[in-house]
Swiss-Prot record:
Its EC number is 3.6.1.1. The keyword Manganese applies. The gene is ppaC. GO terms for cellular component: cytoplasm. Its cofactor is Mn(2+). Mn(2+) 2 binds at residues 13, 66, 88, 147. The lineage of its organism: Archaea, Methanobacteriati, Methanobacteriota, Methanomada group, Methanococci. Belongs to the PPase class C family. This is Manganese-dependent inorganic pyrophosphatase. Keywords: Cobalt, Cytoplasm, Hydrolase, Manganese, Metal-binding. Binds 2 manganese ions per subunit.
Length: 307
């Protein structure tokens, strides 16, 4: 069987892209983890079922969306047959055989899929030309809003905004700004979550020059929702570092309204300080203007480790 699947600890872009691409490719959407509150809100809003949870690639044909890092995918990815990757991140894994690879430096994978649809080019990635239904357009719109933080993230491009407008028309969303705030509020509802749930909402692993680095992020409108849990979050990150072989873990508490992030730093603080040219006082530091893990956190850390 053939599956379209996003990364571990899936976000809205990962889930929405898997669902919509599977629709065009006539195969099955899947997920590699639990649905977060924001994605749950979006799926409920548009009346779409969550994808099947699968934990092994063995015996399956796999199409990856929204990632290409081996550390973010199936633990046994090599036991399946990788068919294609559709993404908006830097190139991660290497393959032993040629595959279809399509990526663009935009704010979300949903933008990539939407552009292919609107340019009548979905067949370029093996898809069938079908009408994009309102519920699926709503999923893609939600994913763009989520990944670009309602177009506030520095990863936002003109193409993201253009695709969002076109998708909103199909989805019947008359006010993107108002709808976007609904999504951001759902994204930032962390007050009822346990510290470990907050950590795992959006946590990704990276290999930087042979060192295991974890970068997590939670985006909030009201920082006070997570303030009282910071100490417990840090203790859990220390345990994670010790038990799972990390050299460094960075956890970003992103203040959507203030447009910056407090970084909790565990492990190799010297490498973090080298990457960002800052001094970590205690266990954290505020990074002014930093909202994107992909564009503003991963590149300087990777350069620091490779330097």
């Amino acid at each position: 069987m053939r599956y379209v699947v996003g990364h571990k600890n899936p976000d809205t872009d990962s889930i929405a892209s898997a669902i919509v691409l599977a629709y065009f490719l006539d195969c099955y959407p899947a997920r590699l983890g639990d649905i977060n509150p924001e994605t749950e809100f979006v799926l409920r809003k548009f009346g779409v079922m969550e994808p099947e949870l699968i934990e092994s690639a063995k015996g399956k044909e796999i199409i990856l969306v929204d990632h290409s890092e081996k550390s973010q995918s199936f633990d046994d990815l090599e036991e399946g047959k990788l068919i294609a990757i559709i993404d908006h991140h830097k190139v991660g894994l290497t393959t032993t055989e040629p595959i279809l690879y399509y990526a663009k430096p935009v704010g979300s994978t949903a933008t990539v899929i939407a552009e292919l649809y609107f340019k009548d080019a979905i067949d370029l990635i093996g898809g069938k030309k079908k009408e994009l239904k309102p519920d699926l357009a709503g999923l893609l719109l939600s994913a763009i809003i989520s990944d670009t933080v309602l177009f506030k993230s520095p990863t936002t491009t003109d193409l993201d905004k253009e695709m969002a407008k076109k998708l909103a028309e199909i989805a019947g969303i008359s006010n993107i700004e108002e709808f976007g705030m609904e999504i951001l509020k759902a994204k930032s509802v962390v007050g009822k979550l346990k510290p470990e749930e907050i950590i795992n909402m959006d946590f990704k692993n990276f290999d930087f020059n042979g060192k295991k680095v974890g970068i997590g992020q939670v985006e909030v409108i009201d920082v006070s929702e997570v303030e009282s849990k910071k100490e417990d979050i840090y203790k859990l990150l220390e345990e994670k570092l010790k038990n799972e072989g990390y050299d460094l873990i960075v956890f970003l508490i992103t203040d959507i309204m203030k447009e910056g992030s407090e970084a909790l730093v565990v492990g190799n603080k010297e490498m973090f300080e080298k990457a960002f040219n800052v001094k970590v006082e205690g266990n954290s530091v505020f990074l002014e203007g930093v909202m994107s893990r992909k564009k503003q956190v991963v590149p300087p850390l990777e350069r620091a480790y490779n330097g």
